[in-house]
Amino acid sequence: MSQKNVGKIVQILGPVVDISFAGQKIPAIYNNLELVFENNKYNFEVAQHIGDEVVRTISMVSTNGLSRGLEVIDTGAPIMVPVGKEVLSRMFNVLGQTIDNKGEIEAKEFRSIHASAPSYEEQNDSSEILETGIKVIDLLVPYSKGGKIGLFGGAGVGKTVLVQELINNIATQHGGLSVFAGVGERTREGNDLYHEMIASGVLDKTTLVFGQMNEPPGARMRVALTGLTMAEYFRDKFKQDVLLFIDNIFRFTQAGSEVSALLGRMPSAVGYQPTLATEMGQLQERITSTKNGSITSVQAVYVPADDLTDPAPATTFTHLDAKTVLERNIAALGIYPAIDPLASSSRMLDPLIIGNEHYLVALEVQNILQRFKELQDIIAILGIGELSEEDKKLVFRARKIRNFLSQPFTVAEKFSGKKGKFVPLKETIRSFKEILEGKHDNLPEDAFLYVGSIDEAIEKAKGQSNATTANNNNA
């Protein structure tokens, strides 16, 4: 910084702060401005030039205690965050400052959180399957390595637990590096995740970045960019395949909406910011694979009032390769993960990519579940006895498939008391194929609930049968 550009605060409206640079050079849009007051550092990002040498900024920290007249210094650059191997196994805030009480890091390189997306020439498309070990995903909504994956669901249907299971399954199997960006979610969840990563031994290959729901909208709006910047460096310089987990992308949109209102912009549909599509595009287009390496992103997306047509989830939909929809009605049946196999989709569900056997099994499972859904009204009104023999057989088989799509999670062991299962893709295809062929029509429906492979369902049914026989003998 050759010469310090000093301004003065002239207005404070919550997280929006107006700063006058009278007689000085006006800071550029996105520049990071700093203020040190009573041993606390405050950072502001320039959002607008409003005339009369005044800039309107968004504070990255709470503005409590600030007053007009305080001097602010222009750093001459956007927010710069540390990158490189030094950030692994550490926890950061939106500004790249450590928050894990392990002291500061000695990073050799810093990067701006604002960057352009890779050009068309640099990008690289991949059709390689990313095996998750979760039956319903691997069979019906296969994920691609280097793809963008969305987990859509309302409040309390299991998005965060599913993200944590994916971290556990993919990060432990996957040899590359992982970045987790906690955007506007509960601090408790971040703390749980941190300790789970320590326990599972993946922390040394992971970077955590948090801007939780108690923080100002500026921090929540930018924290995803901080995490993405660190992931991009691993991809471009280390030439690594990187996993980027974002929980929750809706909070990024929500924070942008708050900031937009505070900046005085006219709201668009349902009160969202008029720049919603632009902001989402700027973030999502940077999450891509290049010839150097890949970024595979898993993004939890909160769906307000379970309405998938809401502008926030609807705008996110357009950027994704796989859409995994979590349904409250399935959760109400006690089936977890509560993934809707009919509403979810993936571009990878193609016989040229996944092979003919996998494709035909997945298609048949979807067809049976679709027919079962159509028969629900008839069953509710007339009863199952009024169905044809063929439809009765289909309904019983569909219920077994529905139950078999459930799975015990490793990260939920302490809640469920059931040991988590990782099911290889070949085993998943074999198991569902046998159910479709009617080989297990004689097994009770509840034998298919919360098991891994079909062999476990057979063992469970035997155990139930033996227990029933023993009870009858005792009686």
Curated annotation (Swiss-Prot):
Gene Ontology, cellular component aspect: plasma membrane; proton-transporting ATP synthase complex
Q: What is its EC number?
A: 7.1.2.2
Keywords from the named record = ATP synthesis, ATP-binding, Cell membrane, CF(1), Hydrogen ion transport, Ion transport, Membrane, Nucleotide-binding, Translocase, Transport
Top enzyme class: translocase
User: Which SMART domains does the entry link to?
Assistant: AAA
Annotated residues for binding of ATP: 153-160
Q: What compartments host this protein? A: Cell membrane
According to its record, how does it sit in the membrane? Peripheral membrane protein
Stretch forming the signal peptide: none
* A Pfam entry, by short name: ATP-synt_ab
Q: Which InterPro entries is this protein grouped with?
A: AAA+_ATPase (IPR003593), ATP-synt_VA_C (IPR055190), ATP_synth_F1_bsu (IPR005722), ATPase_a/bsu_AS (IPR020003), ATPase_alpha/beta_chains (IPR050053), ATPase_F1/V1/A1_a/bsu_N (IPR004100), ATPase_F1/V1/A1_a/bsu_N_sf (IPR036121), ATPase_F1/V1/A1_a/bsu_nucl-bd (IPR000194)
Please give the catalytic activity noted in the UniProt record: ATP + H2O + 4 H(+)(in) = ADP + phosphate + 5 H(+)(out)
Task: List the GO molecular function terms.
Answer: ATP binding; ATP hydrolysis activity; proton-transporting ATP synthase activity, rotational mechanism
Predominant place of localization: membrane
The entry sums up its family as follows: Belongs to the ATPase alpha/beta chains family.
Q: What does this protein do?
A: Produces ATP from ADP in the presence of a proton gradient across the membrane. The catalytic sites are hosted primarily by the beta subunits.
Q: How does it assemble?
A: F-type ATPases have 2 components, CF(1) - the catalytic core - and CF(0) - the membrane proton channel. CF(1) has five subunits: alpha(3), beta(3), gamma(1), delta(1), epsilon(1). CF(0) has three main subunits: a(1), b(2) and c(9-12). The alpha and beta chains form an alternating ring which encloses part of the gamma chain. CF(1) is attached to CF(0) by a central stalk formed by the gamma and epsilon chains, while a peripheral stalk is formed by the delta and b chains.
In its UniProt entry, what is this protein called? Answer: ATP synthase subunit beta 1
